[in-house]
Amino acid sequence: MQTNKPWVSLSVAMLICFGRLQAEDASATPSKSDIENIVREFILQHPEVLMESVQSYRERERVETQERSNAAIGANRSDLLDDPTSPVIGDAGAGIAIVQFFDYQCGYCRRVAPTVSKLLEEHKNVRVIFKELPILGPESHLASRAALAAAKQGAYAPFHQKLLAVDGPITAKAIEELTDQLGLDLARLRRDMSSPEVAAILVHNQRLANTLGVQSTPSFVIGNELIPGAMDLRRFEELISKNSGR
Protein backbone atom coordinates (compact mmCIF):
# COMPACT_ATOMS: atom_id res chain seq x y z
CA MET A 1 0.00 0.00 0.00
CA GLN A 2 1.42 3.36 -1.04
CA THR A 3 1.78 5.94 1.74
CA ASN A 4 1.75 9.66 1.10
CA LYS A 5 4.44 10.77 3.54
CA PRO A 6 3.84 14.55 3.31
CA TRP A 7 0.18 14.11 4.26
CA VAL A 8 1.19 11.86 7.15
CA SER A 9 3.55 14.61 8.26
CA LEU A 10 0.73 17.14 8.03
CA SER A 11 -1.44 14.97 10.25
CA VAL A 12 1.36 14.65 12.79
CA ALA A 13 1.96 18.40 12.72
CA MET A 14 -1.71 19.10 13.35
CA LEU A 15 -1.79 16.63 16.26
CA ILE A 16 1.25 18.28 17.82
CA CYS A 17 -0.30 21.71 17.42
CA PHE A 18 -3.59 20.58 18.92
CA GLY A 19 -1.69 19.00 21.79
CA ARG A 20 0.04 22.28 22.48
CA LEU A 21 -3.21 24.19 22.38
CA GLN A 22 -4.80 21.80 24.82
CA ALA A 23 -1.74 21.92 27.09
CA GLU A 24 -2.09 25.68 27.25
CA ASP A 25 -5.84 25.52 27.73
CA ALA A 26 -7.54 22.20 28.40
CA SER A 27 -10.81 23.58 27.08
CA ALA A 28 -9.31 25.00 23.90
CA THR A 29 -10.76 23.83 20.59
CA PRO A 30 -8.71 24.56 17.46
CA SER A 31 -10.38 27.29 15.46
CA LYS A 32 -10.77 27.39 11.70
CA SER A 33 -8.01 29.99 11.64
CA ASP A 34 -5.68 27.70 13.61
CA ILE A 35 -6.25 24.85 11.17
CA GLU A 36 -5.83 27.08 8.11
CA ASN A 37 -2.55 28.42 9.50
CA ILE A 38 -1.26 24.90 10.13
CA VAL A 39 -2.13 23.79 6.61
CA ARG A 40 -0.69 26.96 5.08
CA GLU A 41 2.58 26.62 6.99
CA PHE A 42 2.86 22.96 6.06
CA ILE A 43 2.27 23.63 2.34
CA LEU A 44 4.85 26.43 2.37
CA GLN A 45 7.35 24.00 3.85
CA HIS A 46 6.31 21.11 1.58
CA PRO A 47 5.11 22.58 -1.76
CA GLU A 48 5.64 19.20 -3.41
CA VAL A 49 2.52 17.92 -1.69
CA LEU A 50 0.35 19.99 -4.03
CA MET A 51 1.96 18.45 -7.10
CA GLU A 52 1.61 14.97 -5.62
CA SER A 53 -2.05 15.64 -4.95
CA VAL A 54 -2.63 16.77 -8.55
CA GLN A 55 -0.74 13.77 -9.92
CA SER A 56 -2.72 11.40 -7.71
CA TYR A 57 -5.97 12.96 -8.86
CA ARG A 58 -4.99 12.72 -12.52
CA GLU A 59 -3.99 9.08 -12.17
CA ARG A 60 -7.26 8.27 -10.43
CA GLU A 61 -9.16 10.02 -13.23
CA ARG A 62 -7.15 8.13 -15.86
CA VAL A 63 -7.91 4.77 -14.26
CA GLU A 64 -11.61 5.57 -13.87
CA THR A 65 -11.82 6.78 -17.47
CA GLN A 66 -10.09 3.61 -18.70
CA GLU A 67 -12.47 1.43 -16.69
CA ARG A 68 -15.50 3.22 -18.13
CA SER A 69 -14.03 2.89 -21.61
CA ASN A 70 -13.36 -0.84 -21.17
CA ALA A 71 -16.94 -1.41 -20.07
CA ALA A 72 -18.24 0.59 -23.04
CA ILE A 73 -16.10 -1.43 -25.44
CA GLY A 74 -17.60 -4.65 -24.12
CA ALA A 75 -21.13 -3.30 -24.39
CA ASN A 76 -20.59 -2.05 -27.95
CA ARG A 77 -18.42 -4.84 -29.34
CA SER A 78 -20.86 -5.67 -32.12
CA ASP A 79 -20.90 -2.07 -33.37
CA LEU A 80 -17.12 -2.03 -33.26
CA LEU A 81 -16.41 -5.32 -34.99
CA ASP A 82 -19.47 -6.34 -36.99
CA ASP A 83 -20.85 -3.14 -38.52
CA PRO A 84 -21.10 -3.82 -42.28
CA THR A 85 -20.89 -0.08 -43.04
CA SER A 86 -17.37 0.19 -41.59
CA PRO A 87 -14.66 -0.42 -44.21
CA VAL A 88 -12.08 -3.10 -43.48
CA ILE A 89 -8.53 -3.44 -44.78
CA GLY A 90 -6.88 -6.82 -44.38
CA ASP A 91 -8.37 -10.30 -44.38
CA ALA A 92 -12.00 -9.93 -43.30
CA GLY A 93 -11.67 -13.25 -41.46
CA ALA A 94 -8.47 -12.33 -39.61
CA GLY A 95 -8.65 -13.26 -35.95
CA ILE A 96 -7.29 -9.99 -34.58
CA ALA A 97 -9.24 -6.79 -35.17
CA ILE A 98 -7.97 -3.27 -34.69
CA VAL A 99 -10.55 -0.50 -34.82
CA GLN A 100 -9.27 2.95 -35.79
CA PHE A 101 -11.14 6.21 -35.30
CA PHE A 102 -9.51 8.81 -37.53
CA ASP A 103 -9.77 12.07 -39.45
CA TYR A 104 -8.13 12.60 -42.84
CA GLN A 105 -7.03 16.10 -41.86
CA CYS A 106 -5.35 14.85 -38.67
CA GLY A 107 -1.56 15.06 -38.86
CA TYR A 108 -1.03 12.17 -36.45
CA CYS A 109 -3.46 10.02 -38.44
CA ARG A 110 -1.36 10.65 -41.51
CA ARG A 111 1.81 9.94 -39.58
CA VAL A 112 0.60 6.56 -38.30
CA ALA A 113 -0.84 5.45 -41.67
CA PRO A 114 2.42 3.89 -42.99
CA THR A 115 2.79 2.01 -39.70
CA VAL A 116 -0.73 0.61 -40.01
CA SER A 117 0.03 -0.45 -43.59
CA LYS A 118 3.26 -2.16 -42.51
CA LEU A 119 1.42 -3.89 -39.69
CA LEU A 120 -1.09 -5.32 -42.16
CA GLU A 121 1.70 -6.44 -44.49
CA GLU A 122 3.61 -8.26 -41.76
CA HIS A 123 0.68 -9.68 -39.80
CA LYS A 124 -1.83 -11.44 -42.01
CA ASN A 125 -3.90 -12.39 -38.96
CA VAL A 126 -4.79 -8.71 -38.41
CA ARG A 127 -7.57 -6.66 -39.95
CA VAL A 128 -8.18 -2.94 -39.42
CA ILE A 129 -11.73 -1.63 -39.18
CA PHE A 130 -11.94 2.05 -40.05
CA LYS A 131 -14.36 4.37 -38.28
CA GLU A 132 -14.49 7.67 -40.11
CA LEU A 133 -14.58 10.43 -37.47
CA PRO A 134 -14.38 13.84 -39.20
CA ILE A 135 -13.88 16.24 -36.29
CA LEU A 136 -11.57 18.84 -37.81
CA GLY A 137 -13.89 20.83 -40.04
CA PRO A 138 -15.67 20.82 -43.40
CA GLU A 139 -12.73 19.35 -45.33
CA SER A 140 -12.71 16.39 -42.95
CA HIS A 141 -16.42 15.76 -43.57
CA LEU A 142 -15.90 16.05 -47.31
CA ALA A 143 -13.05 13.54 -47.23
CA SER A 144 -14.93 11.02 -45.09
CA ARG A 145 -18.03 11.19 -47.27
CA ALA A 146 -15.88 10.68 -50.36
CA ALA A 147 -14.10 7.68 -48.84
CA LEU A 148 -17.37 6.03 -47.84
CA ALA A 149 -18.75 6.71 -51.31
CA ALA A 150 -15.64 5.16 -52.86
CA ALA A 151 -16.26 2.08 -50.70
CA LYS A 152 -19.53 1.58 -52.58
CA GLN A 153 -17.45 1.19 -55.74
CA GLY A 154 -15.12 -1.30 -54.06
CA ALA A 155 -12.27 1.20 -53.85
CA TYR A 156 -12.09 2.17 -50.19
CA ALA A 157 -8.50 1.05 -49.56
CA PRO A 158 -6.81 2.88 -52.47
CA PHE A 159 -9.00 5.96 -52.04
CA HIS A 160 -8.25 5.98 -48.30
CA GLN A 161 -4.50 5.83 -48.91
CA LYS A 162 -4.59 8.59 -51.50
CA LEU A 163 -6.65 10.87 -49.25
CA LEU A 164 -4.08 10.45 -46.48
CA ALA A 165 -1.36 11.44 -48.94
CA VAL A 166 -3.05 14.66 -50.13
CA ASP A 167 -0.75 17.61 -49.54
CA GLY A 168 -2.85 20.36 -47.97
CA PRO A 169 -6.60 20.73 -47.46
CA ILE A 170 -8.79 18.09 -49.06
CA THR A 171 -10.98 19.99 -51.52
CA ALA A 172 -13.70 18.95 -53.95
CA LYS A 173 -11.17 19.35 -56.76
CA ALA A 174 -8.70 17.04 -55.02
CA ILE A 175 -11.43 14.43 -54.64
CA GLU A 176 -12.31 14.70 -58.33
CA GLU A 177 -8.65 14.16 -59.23
CA LEU A 178 -8.40 11.08 -57.01
CA THR A 179 -11.62 9.72 -58.47
CA ASP A 180 -10.20 10.12 -61.97
CA GLN A 181 -6.87 8.52 -61.00
CA LEU A 182 -8.66 5.44 -59.70
CA GLY A 183 -11.07 5.25 -62.62
CA LEU A 184 -14.18 5.63 -60.46
CA ASP A 185 -17.58 6.92 -61.53
CA LEU A 186 -17.56 10.57 -60.42
CA ALA A 187 -21.30 11.11 -60.84
CA ARG A 188 -22.04 8.06 -58.71
CA LEU A 189 -19.47 9.13 -56.13
CA ARG A 190 -21.12 12.53 -55.79
CA ARG A 191 -24.56 10.95 -55.37
CA ASP A 192 -23.33 8.56 -52.73
CA MET A 193 -21.46 11.32 -50.90
CA SER A 194 -24.76 13.17 -50.48
CA SER A 195 -26.79 10.10 -49.57
CA PRO A 196 -28.62 9.74 -46.24
CA GLU A 197 -26.85 6.41 -45.75
CA VAL A 198 -23.39 7.98 -45.72
CA ALA A 199 -24.58 10.78 -43.44
CA ALA A 200 -26.03 8.18 -41.05
CA ILE A 201 -22.72 6.30 -40.90
CA LEU A 202 -20.89 9.43 -39.78
CA VAL A 203 -23.52 10.22 -37.15
CA HIS A 204 -23.34 6.66 -35.87
CA ASN A 205 -19.54 6.78 -35.67
CA GLN A 206 -19.65 10.03 -33.71
CA ARG A 207 -22.13 8.58 -31.22
CA LEU A 208 -20.04 5.45 -30.82
CA ALA A 209 -16.91 7.54 -30.27
CA ASN A 210 -18.70 9.57 -27.60
CA THR A 211 -19.91 6.41 -25.88
CA LEU A 212 -16.41 4.96 -25.77
CA GLY A 213 -14.82 8.19 -24.60
CA VAL A 214 -12.81 8.82 -27.76
CA GLN A 215 -11.47 12.36 -27.38
CA SER A 216 -8.94 12.61 -30.20
CA THR A 217 -7.75 11.09 -33.43
CA PRO A 218 -6.26 8.71 -34.07
CA SER A 219 -7.69 6.41 -31.40
CA PHE A 220 -7.49 2.64 -31.57
CA VAL A 221 -9.49 -0.14 -29.98
CA ILE A 222 -7.51 -3.35 -29.54
CA GLY A 223 -9.15 -6.04 -27.46
CA ASN A 224 -10.71 -4.30 -24.48
CA GLU A 225 -8.44 -1.28 -24.62
CA LEU A 226 -8.92 2.20 -26.04
CA ILE A 227 -5.54 3.65 -26.97
CA PRO A 228 -5.32 7.30 -28.05
CA GLY A 229 -2.58 8.62 -30.30
CA ALA A 230 -0.19 7.40 -32.95
CA MET A 231 1.96 4.37 -32.13
CA ASP A 232 5.03 2.71 -33.58
CA LEU A 233 5.01 -0.83 -34.93
CA ARG A 234 6.46 -2.36 -31.78
CA ARG A 235 3.69 -0.88 -29.62
CA PHE A 236 1.03 -2.23 -31.99
CA GLU A 237 2.64 -5.67 -31.81
CA GLU A 238 2.76 -5.54 -28.01
CA LEU A 239 -0.93 -4.72 -27.82
CA ILE A 240 -1.80 -7.41 -30.36
CA SER A 241 0.15 -10.00 -28.36
CA LYS A 242 -1.48 -8.84 -25.12
CA ASN A 243 -5.00 -9.07 -26.52
CA SER A 244 -4.68 -11.97 -28.96
CA GLY A 245 -6.05 -14.47 -26.46
CA ARG A 246 -9.18 -12.45 -25.72
Each model region followed by its residue ranges:
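N-terminal targeting signals for export/organelle localization
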Residues: 2-3, 12, 16-78
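C-terminal cap of thioredoxin/glutaredoxin-like
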Residues: 5, 24-40, 60, 177-246
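Flexible, active-site-adjacent loop/turn segments at secondary-structure boundaries
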Residues: 41-42, 47, 79, 86-87, ...
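A generic local structural motif
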Residues: 83-87, 114-115, 206-207
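Gly/lys/ser-thr-rich phosphate-binding loops in alpha/beta enzymes
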Residues: 2-24, 93-122
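Structural alpha/beta surface segment adjacent to cysteine/selenocysteine redox centers
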Residues: 99, 104-105, 110-185, 190, ...
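Extracytoplasmic/secreted proteins, especially bacterial periplasmic and envelope-associated proteins
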Residues: 34, 38, 45, 49-52, ...
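A short beta-strand-turn-helix
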Residues: 78-96, 120-121
